[in-house]
Regions:
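Boundary regions of SH3-family modules and the immediately adjacent low-complexity/disordered segments
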Residues: 10-12, 19, 26-34, 40-75, ...
Length: 128
């Protein structure tokens, strides 16, 4: 859905605290209650959303600060594919546990970023 309401509690009776209007923004699920999920967004805001409004497709966001360099291969000094500005949202294609690099896609660009340079994947998490 293009609009997702963040509520203060796990029920439609609770007031809406925020309405997200950004598709594929990554969130962290921190609690569950029936058909509701308590989430944390990249800004640290927490609240409840209905589970059917969340997708299992994994995404990332470039946090505030400097541009991130998307590399052709998972190594420092590999050819630059693109520069991703803070706020860019993309798709996590693959992250292997114990590997500092993740294969990602942002728009038409595919390449590799260090997991520490993005928000949306835990330090030792595997994403396939």
């Amino acid at each position: 859905s293009n609009q997702v309401n963040l509520r203060v509690g796990p029920d439609l009776r609770y007031p809406i605290e925020w309405t997200y209007q950004r598709r594929d923004l990554p969130v962290q699920i921190i609690d569950e209650h029936q058909l509701w999920r308590r989430i944390r967004d990249p800004e640290g805001t927490e609240g409840w959303v209905q589970r059917p409004l969340l997708t299992s497709r994994r995404s990332f966001v470039v946090p505030a600060g400097a541009d991130r360099v998307l590399r052709r291969r998972p190594e420092e000094g590999a050819a630059e594919v693109a520069r991703l500005r803070p706020g860019v949202v993309g798709r996590l294609r693959k992250c292997e546990a114990g590997n500092p690099w993740c294969e990602v896609q942002a728009g038409d660009y595919r390449g590799w970023l260090k997991r520490g340079e993005i928000w949306g994947v835990a330090p030792d998490e595997a994403v396939n």
